[in-house]
């Protein structure tokens, strides 16, 4: 059985903010659509290979960098939970994981 993908409200909001930023910055959604596809494809790979990410601070949380974004997640045999998507160009002191 395939793992279920669960997005925390914070992670989903992170994704929307990132995509909106690029829509507004560029003036169209070409780049944001491509970025969204990249992120979703990567998450599909995490379902198959959940240990790809590096363990975060001796917790069950893992982190994987994709382009300029850190994707924080945890997993069990039944689900993959996306916890946060962080733009690495932002101030790391604001990271709430």
Residue ranges and their predicted role:
Residues 66-70, 74-97:
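Enriched for short, Lys/Arg-rich terminal
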Residues 2-60:
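Basic, Lys/Arg-enriched alpha-helical interface segments
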Residues 1-4, 95-97:
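Short, Lys/Arg-enriched, disordered terminal segments
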